[in-house]
Amino acid sequence: MKKLIALLLVLGGLLALVACGFPVQYKDGGDGGKDETPVVQPDNGYTLGSTDVVQLNGFRSIDIEWISGSVTVELYDGEGIELKEALADGGAVSVPMEWRVDEDDSTLDVCSQPKLLSVSEEKHLTVKLPRSMVLHELDVETVSAAVSVDLTDEDTLTLNELDITSVSGTVYVNAANAGEISLSTTSGAISGSVRTQNLEADSVSGSVELTLDVLPTELDMETSSGPVTLTLPAGDTAPSLFVEFRTTSGQFASDVPVTHMKDAPWELQTVSGSVTIALAQ
């Protein structure tokens, strides 16, 4: 369970960043009063607030760090990248997000708020990517924010790596077409459909329920108590899988023939969580 331990350490670091920020300062309302609008300054090199289009030429990756609320990534007909944020309750955002273009790393960095603020708001972030975009990596890290990545429209986006990590937020992916996909959570559920040759999913107590549009060449899944359900694509003949399944008290069930062997291309490890491999109807 080394990967699960590493996951907990990473997620603990995210929580520490939230807890260790500076107290937020507020504007002087005059006449001894206090304006409840916080004074927010961006980190060095960052810009505050939503932006209609970020023009990116030859960009390598997008890194998103979000605390609470939700993150939605989808495709659209534009030529740049749209970043929009809004409060969950529809109110005005008082602690805006910040973003920057890192020319050295060819990366777009997006944060839910300046890193040294201790206050946070439950906000929805919508990221729209051009359908024709070529991107090496999309990396999303959240604390309690739910993550939804929907790349269904014509599957024209070229993406090499998709990496999503959350503490308690749910993770949903739809037709995520990438060379490598990694999905990690502590207590949030992981669900959706994926198309990849290399799939990794890690959970402690959250469930994992994924439909595989194609059979990955390599698959690695670890859970503690969360159940795992993998639905394979339907075909004229059922595939025969080579699987290494390690567990303490978990159960394994499969609708297709499985050969259990050490160091198999598909590795499934649980403590008490069940694993089910089903065939799409």
Region locations from a protein language model:
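Positively charged n-region of N-terminal signal peptides that target proteins for export
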Residues: 1-8
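Repetitive helical segments and hydrophobic/amphipathic motifs
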Residues: 11-12
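C-terminal motif of bacterial Sec signal peptides marking the signal peptidase cleavage site
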Residues: 16-19
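Short linear S-[DN]-x-LW-Φ motif typified by the pepsin-like aspartic protease active-site region
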Residues: 22-105, 124-136, 146-161, 265-267, ...
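Repetitive beta-strand solenoid architecture
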Residues: 58, 67, 77, 121-123, ...
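Polar/charged low-complexity regions in secreted precursors and cytosolic/nuclear IDRs
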Residues: 63-65, 117, 139-141, 145, ...
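Secondary-structure transition/turn motif
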Residues: 87-89, 110-123
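Short, surface-exposed interaction patches in beta-rich subdomains
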Residues: 174-176, 180-181, 189-281
